[in-house]
């Protein structure tokens, strides 16, 4: 399809006209089971009545004013997020990259206020935090940074799930002010952190006076079966970032702060034109209401466990399958070879997925996914994987 669009996406040859629940329809009225949810964004699926009503009603009243005025919807969503997370304050923006950029700025400003004029942040290998220059510098992907140097300095990358490496990095660099990590790496191949590792990092940050900053852009808002994935480890970060599913498809991001990170910013130290507008925040409130009222945390946990077990059982012993892993409805199937073609083959079979880290099939279906729909994913995907592996022998 020729267009005036910048050539930055390797798009699949399909476009969709409408959706309902976990299903999408293309221009030829063919139906697809959406097991990707816009890469974890459409957490309520498509056409959710409560979300549609909230967006429609708010759009009819007021779409945008400015953050130089009070925004009641913004204040209401901030209160709900604070209640759910135990955090103290919320800064809204428009995306995960912006949320993480704000977190990086906060960590540097936190250090600056303590006399550290070149604050350093410890980050993890294989991580993903965004495409702005600072978030790229924090991201554990040389490929993503290629051609965009020089990168901002002040980031120290260590192996994921390696507490001694974090401790050693802090001993080697006295200007460390924060640790930034994902509880469950998404773009990094659906790699979960150990609960003991998370608890150890929390303790280490407390001992050293560092901020623990957790990127929940992909894993937050119920995807793993709790509101936020770090809650499985029974810890609280000092900074948390959110986006993707927060407003069910309306662009929004958020940076939450607590403890020593709360109150670091002051008027003029950060800002955004569109962040936390009435429309996006009304959508965010509707998403939280739906997750609570429809029991979607429990559904994500139970249906996710069912899907995980079914995939693991059907693929057990299959040559070329390394592991099925993840939590809730954030799952990955790692193969021993590049498998990007599986996204196309699955689409041709009526299933939407994607592949990350070249050889990990990623599943991020809506939180409303039923057990029957999970079984449909298995029935379509498992034969495709086995056929692909057999052809590659």
Swiss-Prot record:
The modification N6-(pyridoxal phosphate)lysine is found at residue 244. It is found in: Cytoplasm. Its cofactor is pyridoxal 5'-phosphate. Pfam families: Aminotran_3. GO terms for cellular component: cytoplasm. GO terms for molecular function: identical protein binding; N2-acetyl-L-ornithine:2-oxoglutarate 5-aminotransferase activity; pyridoxal phosphate binding. SUPFAM superfamilies: PLP-dependent transferases. Binds 1 pyridoxal phosphate per subunit. It catalyses: N(2)-acetyl-L-ornithine + 2-oxoglutarate = N-acetyl-L-glutamate 5-semialdehyde + L-glutamate. InterPro entries: AcOrn/SuccOrn_fam, Aminotrans_3, Aminotrans_3_PPA_site, Class-III_PLP-dep_AT, PyrdxlP-dep_Trfase, PyrdxlP-dep_Trfase_major, PyrdxlP-dep_Trfase_small. It is an enzyme of class 2 (transferase). Pathway: Amino-acid biosynthesis; L-arginine biosynthesis; N(2)-acetyl-L-ornithine from L-glutamate: step 4/4. Its EC number is 2.6.1.11. GO terms for biological process: L-arginine biosynthetic process. N(2)-acetyl-L-ornithine binds at residues 131, 272. Gene3D superfamilies: Aspartate Aminotransferase, domain 1, Type I PLP-dependent aspartate aminotransferase-like (Major domain). Its main location: cytoplasm. Keywords: Amino-acid biosynthesis, Aminotransferase, Arginine biosynthesis, Cytoplasm, Pyridoxal phosphate, Transferase. Homodimer. May also have succinyldiaminopimelate aminotransferase activity, thus carrying out the corresponding step in lysine biosynthesis. PANTHER family: ACETYLORNITHINE AMINOTRANSFERASE, MITOCHONDRIAL (PTHR11986:SF79), AMINOTRANSFERASE CLASS III (PTHR11986). Belongs to the class-III pyridoxal-phosphate-dependent aminotransferase family. ArgD subfamily. NCBIfam families: argD, PRK01278.1. HAMAP family: ArgD_aminotrans_3. This is Acetylornithine aminotransferase 1. It comes from Bordetella pertussis (strain Tohama I / ATCC BAA-589 / NCTC 13251). The gene is argD1.
